[in-house]
Amino acid sequence: MDSASKEETLEKLDQEITVNLQKIDSNLSFCFHKITQDIIPHVATYSEICERIMDSTEWLGTMFQETGLVNLQANAAAPVGNAPVKSVVSNNVGIFPTSAEEASRESQTDNGPNEADSAVHVNRDVHSMFTNDSIDDFHTANITSTGQILKLPDSSDEDTGSEAVPSREQTDLTGEGHGGADDEQDESTIQRQSRKRKISLLLQQQYGSSSSMVPSPIVPNKMRKQLAHEEHINNDGDNDDENSNNIESSPLKQGHHHPKGQADDNNEGPDEEESTKEVPKPGTIIHFSTNR
């Protein structure tokens, strides 16, 4: 009984193995047919399309390269009436010649002087069609060589009061005649005077409108030193007043209030006199010496 049961199980296993092998075989055959019948033809068509694209791109590249050698004069010359037509292009040479020498040789041998002139006119007409007339007029306009020579402005340092040295070009231009040099000297003196007037007006406006002692950027060095000294004196006076007020506020120093106030009044007198002497009053005009 045991041997019979074993044989039955072996047969069942053999049958299952054969069934699975048949399934595997059928699947492999299906894959093979799918690859050979569906995938390979599509790949072949795709490769053909790629080859066509490569051929067309190569043809376009050669066409663009040969367009620079097109003989426009041979194609532009047209027959007139019943006149005999000359063989403009030979049988071996197409519309795109192989080299520039052949194109020039064809234009010299095949085309006469009249045909060459007509071709030049045709090319000019085509150029005028694709270009703007206003731009051509702008590029072909008459250019005049005459012009006005501009003078360089006089550069001077306001702090030091130094005058600018004339450049070499101005000296060369003004060295032709003595009269021209005199005129320019007169103009320079007028400019210096006007500049000094402007400085004086600015100083007057500053000291007339505000009471601050901030030096302006156009004030000379001497004025700046005086203003800085006055600011220092005023600041010292303010500090002394603050210290005196602090001392007087204490109860121990109540008895010394009047002498300290008198001393401060006596000390403030000369400072005010010095400030009135050094600071110019509003409305004064400051004159500067000219070093020529």
From Swiss-Prot:
One of its GO terms (biological process) is mitotic sister chromatid biorientation. It comes from the Eukaryota. The modification Phosphoserine is found at residues 26, 118, 134, 155-156, 200, 216, 250. It is found in: Nucleus; Cytoplasm, Cytoskeleton, Spindle; Chromosome, Centromere, Kinetochore; Chromosome. The modification Phosphothreonine is found at residue 140. Signal peptide: none annotated. GO terms for cellular component: cytoplasm; DASH complex; microtubule; mitotic spindle; mitotic spindle pole body. Residues 265-275 have a biased composition (Acidic residues). Transmembrane segments: none annotated. The keyword Phosphoprotein applies. Keywords: Cell cycle, Cell division, Centromere, Chromosome, Chromosome partition, Cytoplasm, Cytoskeleton, Kinetochore, Microtubule, Mitosis, Nucleus, Phosphoprotein. It holds the Pfam family DASH_Ask1. The keyword Heme does not apply. InterPro entries: DASH_Ask1. Residues 99-118, 149-194, 226-292 are annotated as: Disordered. Component of the DASH complex that connects microtubules with kinetochores and couples microtubule depolymerisation to chromosome movement; it is involved in retrieving kinetochores to the spindle poles before their re-orientation on the spindle in early mitosis and allows microtubule depolymerization to pull chromosomes apart and resist detachment during anaphase. Component of the DASH complex consisting of ASK1, DAD1, DAD2, DAD3, DAD4, DAM1, DUO1, HSK3, SPC19 and SPC34, with a stoichiometry of one copy of each subunit per complex. Multiple DASH complexes oligomerize to form a ring that encircles spindle microtubules and organizes the rod-like NDC80 complexes of the outer kinetochore. DASH complex oligomerization strengthens microtubule attachments. On cytoplasmic microtubules, DASH complexes appear to form patches instead of rings. Belongs to the DASH complex ASK1 family. This is DASH complex subunit ASK1. It comes from Saccharomyces cerevisiae (strain YJM789) (Baker's yeast).
